Swiss-Prot record:
Protein name: Autophagy-related protein 9
The protein's role, per its UniProt record: Phospholipid scramblase involved in autophagy and cytoplasm to vacuole transport (Cvt) vesicle formation. Cycles between the preautophagosomal structure/phagophore assembly site (PAS) and the cytoplasmic vesicle pool and supplies membrane for the growing autophagosome. Lipid scramblase activity plays a key role in preautophagosomal structure/phagophore assembly by distributing the phospholipids that arrive through ATG2 from the cytoplasmic to the luminal leaflet of the bilayer, thereby driving autophagosomal membrane expansion. Required for mitophagy.
Cytoplasmic side: 1-255, 444-511, 533-544, 633-642, 664-888
Post-translational modification: Phosphorylated by ATG1. ATG1 phosphorylation is required for ATG18 interaction and preautophagosome elongation.
Domain of life: Eukaryota
Listed transmembrane segments: 256-276, 423-443, 545-565, 612-632
Amino acid sequence: MASNIFSRIKSPSGGSQSFYQQLRSGEDPEYDPGLDEENLGHRFDDFQAEGMDIGDSSMTVESVAPGSKGKGKATFRPTAHARSSGITSPRWQQDDDGDNEVPASLLMEPKDLDPPASPPNKRATNPGSSRTPASVGPSSARTRAQWEAATAQQQLHQDHPYTTPMGPQPIPVARGTMSNNPREKALWRWVNTSNLDSFMRDVYDYFEGGGLWCILCANALWLFQCIDYSRVPDSRSLHEVIVPQCTRKMSGLWNFAIWLYTFFFIWKCVQYFVEIRRLTYIRDFYIYLLDIPEQDMQTISWQDVVARIMALREENPKTATNISPRLRQFMGSQSKERLDALDIANRLMRKENYLIAMINKDILDLSLPVPFLRGRQMFSKTMEWYLQYCILDMAFNELGQVQQDFLRPDRRRLLSQKLRQRFLFAGFLNLLFAPVVLAYVVIVYFFTYYYEYQKDPKQAAARKYTSLAEWKFRQFNELPHIFYERLHMSYPFATRYIDQFPKRITEAVARTIAFMSGAITAILAIGSVLDSELFLNFEITKDRPVIFYLGVFAAIWATTRGMVSEETLVFNPEYALRNVIEYTRYVPDHWKNKLHSSEVKQEFSELYKMKVVIFLEEMMGIVTTPMLLLFSLPRCSDQIVDFFREFTIHVDGLGYVCSFAVFDFQKGPGNTGPQGPRPDVREDYYSTKHGKMAASYYGFLDNYAANPKTGIPGHLPPGPKPSFHPPPSFPGIGSPTLAADMQGSHIGRTGTETGRARSRAPGGRGPRIGVMPQPSPMASMLLDQHHQPPGGNMVARSLHASRYPRGYRGESQIIEETEASSIRRNGEDDELYEPGGALGESVWETSPARGVTRENSAANTEDPEAGVLGLIYQLQQTQRPRRGGGMV
């Protein structure tokens, strides 16, 4: 909608289409990278077989009887239409021209025999159906006879488009039956869904809203939350509080604001009633197709919803094979066969993934060209709205697909110019509506936090993450409810980390002021208790009684006491920050070995600010946003266009998505750690920063592969008792392999070696006793077969299910691997039989119910120079009995 308005404003004079009309049309016959143009140009529908007559064919077959002397040949003869239009034969025909000898035994009809009498053809009664072959020559009558004989034996198409075909046909659902069966209506809407992105967005919004009645109640209460009823208790009738003709006494600005709010209120009311029908359709989809009643909407997990959608997909497979090219193009992005957990997440976050990647790779210049503000990123909710309008609304069409012009290198200059114009137009638009937006932000903030601050004044100093921090912390394909669950769990640890740093000077001053204000407050309070009537009316200063100063000094005492740290607080900022990293999963590279420093604390404080400061920055953002749109963002328009072209791929059945959002579960996240060779500039450009790709990969597996029934990352369900593994058979005393087996087992270890191996974790923690429970049997149900990760990736360790206890977070909890772990390559048995390892290992664990087995441990210890002894050792490892289990 915004692009249409902008296109009308910038439309050229004359009858030619504007740039945005050409962009929205999206039909370019010369460029269609994701489809096979040669095959899509042909329609092989059985209801259009009339166009496949022998006369319209470009190939004729000359048959010879098996007993004849001639040799059967299949010759290519261009038709008159082909010769006149200058159409050459395709490549596959030119390659086969030399090999056109057909054995006589494979020919269809004898050459000399007359064809049998064919039954009367019903198509002959239709004057438009009969066609005269375009080929001329002596073979025309013979080929026509052969064609009639072949069609008489086996019809290739329906005789008449309006006649009833013979044989059993599917029975259509009667109109009365469908109108009385809500499940059939819901199934019909599901089958005829034309925009899967929009439909899945409605399904997710319905799930996140908690059902039909919760959404309607929230919308109805929103319409009346700005009404003030403070004057109602003081009056007895309505006319006492109404000022007659009050608008005449107001200024023009107030009248404009009242009328604007009135139209906005009416528009929201209309939208509220229109939305009921759409919500009813989604409600029927949940109740009748997914078997989820309304009362379970507030308790069911999203993973269970995805499993039911996949089951519904399996119950209604695709049956049509002969489809038109336009429908084939449509199904290239709207196929219901691509509806597992990863595909649904890609559809819901198709646009958000691009914004996450652009912020991660610093494509957007969010700093002002001002000397004292250079280098400081200005990002607010207002800025987020304009980024959605300027970039995403231009890059995507109505179906949620990336415009193909963004994928063409020859359109780079024009797109960059138009994007720069959109930034400038949005900047002037923001300057025009800045007063309205400022009033809206102030009113919403006041009505939202007034009661909270009045009830608890300490909430004024409460902190929360900024909008920029949320986009930095968010991972690819991470849905909003999963992201905010993870983020909200980090708030206590983030507050504890901020309070960790020593502020001795501030605390000393705060203690002194708290002691003085507390003493004065105590004296005034005791005096008011002894003689309340006389003391409370006593004025210490002019018109300022005792109760006034009692409130002032009590507020000062409460504020200063809040600035003093608790006496039981243990000072360990590095440990506190690791607890934060466990949930935010955000660790820049320059934070390594500096988690205790004040520099890291200052950078984290820019992401975790007080709510009052965030509100002031939001109001200041109304002024800084147009400056960014006018001066900073137009300079990076070329990089934005290049980003969409270079980081967009086409997935069959899904459409165009961000390349970072397509997880290759067969290969894993790749070599993202620094243990390998240093990547070159090209690899650095095509990879994410701060381990975002690896964090998103393992985070997705942690949410959808561990236990989809609960929806809690890293949760272990109560499973059955572990299966019994018999002990291995030991060799005899005289066996030459006994010494080697004893040396590689726990029995042959000395106490020093065992103690050293067990004391790698702090506190000398020994190996875990017992076999851990097996993962849920639904662990592989939310991913299709082509998305199933191999067994080695399923045991990757995650932050939510760390192998260390919560009391310790070692250096390895930085998301990426920080060093090559030589201990991991030694193959000790305690590392094979328990989920443990060295400090340098990554701690992502997506399947906490599994340990590292001999199979997947040996898979990561490849040595290209092993030699003969290494091969013998690998053979011995494969012949040993394996413990642990894997998912199929």
